[in-house]
Amino acid sequence: MTNIRKTHPLLKIVNHSLIDLPAPSNISAWWNFGSLLGLCLIIQILTGLFLAMHYTSDTTTAFSSVTHICRDVNHGWLIRYLHANGASMFFICLYMHVGRGIYYGSYTYLETWNIGILLLFTVMATAFMGYVLPWGQMSFWGATVITNLLSAIPYIGTSLVEWIWGGFSVDKATLTRFFAFHFILPFIIAALVMVHLLFLHETGSNNPSGIPSNSDKIPFHPYYTIKDALGFLMLITLLLLLALFAPDLLGDPDNYSPANPLNTPPHIKPEWYFLFAYAILRSIPNKLGGVLALVMSILVLAIIPLLHTSKQRSMMFRPLSQTLFWILVADLMTLTWIGAQPVEHPFTTIGQVASVLYFALILILMPLAGLIENKILKW
């Protein structure tokens, strides 16, 4: 008799995705981040659900309700810190996952890649709206600054901002709708993840060499289920270490002061995972130019497949491209550091140089490196 997992309509889907899936025999730990992102999403949805049971999305009580969660709810402090630091883990895994895609040429799977970019945008929007909910100083001013960027859009800008705010400033209506969106978006993300996987399973996974591996496949279970389980263990350990020993390490002390529209914090800055984009935004003196650069800093990922000039898919055997890739990583770290600094000399200049380098690397230098490597190999 055929095994039920191969015949049952529902189990068959699980079987083809997680058990009998033919996987390349040589995929490294860099291929673990997809499943880790799935785990992060589950953790965030579960902790978020329990937080939503005690949270109130009203300007007068939002801050107190978060305090109440931490002080009075059983293990509320743990749920809150798992959720806050879970977001950081989510973005660490996201950036590693995208970096892996760039390094090993996984972006040649166009549908999978483009859904991935859409997922990145959606996760960023969700995280931004979640940061507004505790209604601390940085929540309020972060929401004010970022939503205000839309006013740079010609003609409709101001009306658009007021429509999003639901009034003439960030207020009760804004907080309520941000809570609604923050609750619904993770489920939209989960649906997009299914589409992401659907397209991935049309082609099968890439591998470090970038060479088709159809002649050498192994079943996903037990080989990669056990490998993923090890990744899960490491991620959960790291998250627990963060949440239990240094819960506020990555947060902003300003967010422990209730939102006050009459008092602007000296340095308005987002959470660490948005700092690179924030630095690019600030490096351009013009408002509309800055907003366009901010959007392009992520949207540039969609252009990468069009700029693939090398005859090889992966960077595994391309030392010149590898060097540029790691310069790009260092550049992003520099931008992250600059985004947290005040707008003064020499930080402004460093930010401008790093921003120009970021776009130059992706749009000019890396495609050029591919052509040079082809030339060296006489291809």
Curated annotation (Swiss-Prot):
Membrane topology: Multi-pass membrane protein
UniProt cross-references to CDD domains, sorted A to Z: cytochrome_b_C (cd00290), Cytochrome_b_N (cd00284)
Entry protein name: Cytochrome b
Self-association state and partner proteins as the record states: The cytochrome bc1 complex contains 11 subunits: 3 respiratory subunits (MT-CYB, CYC1 and UQCRFS1), 2 core proteins (UQCRC1 and UQCRC2) and 6 low-molecular weight proteins (UQCRH/QCR6, UQCRB/QCR7, UQCRQ/QCR8, UQCR10/QCR9, UQCR11/QCR10 and a cleavage product of UQCRFS1). This cytochrome bc1 complex then forms a dimer.
Originating organism: Pronolagus rupestris
Major site of localization recorded for this protein: mitochondrion
Pfam family, one: Cytochrome_B
Family annotation (InterPro entries): Cyt_b/b6_C (IPR005798), Cyt_b/b6_C_sf (IPR036150), Cyt_b/b6_N (IPR005797), Cytb/b6-like_sf (IPR027387), Cytochrome_b (IPR030689), Cytochrome_b_C_euk/bac (IPR048260), Cytochrome_b_N_euk/bac (IPR048259), Di-haem_cyt_TM (IPR016174)
Alphabetical list of PANTHER family matching this protein: CYTOCHROME B (PTHR19271:SF16)
UniProt: a ubiquinone binding residues: H201
Function of the molecule: Component of the ubiquinol-cytochrome c reductase complex (complex III or cytochrome b-c1 complex) that is part of the mitochondrial respiratory chain. The b-c1 complex mediates electron transfer from ubiquinol to cytochrome c. Contributes to the generation of a proton gradient across the mitochondrial membrane that is then used for ATP synthesis.
A GO-annotated cellular component: respiratory chain complex III
List of residues binding heme b b562: H83, H182
Further remarks about this protein from its record: Heme 1 (or BL or b562) is low-potential and absorbs at about 562 nm, and heme 2 (or BH or b566) is high-potential and absorbs at about 566 nm.
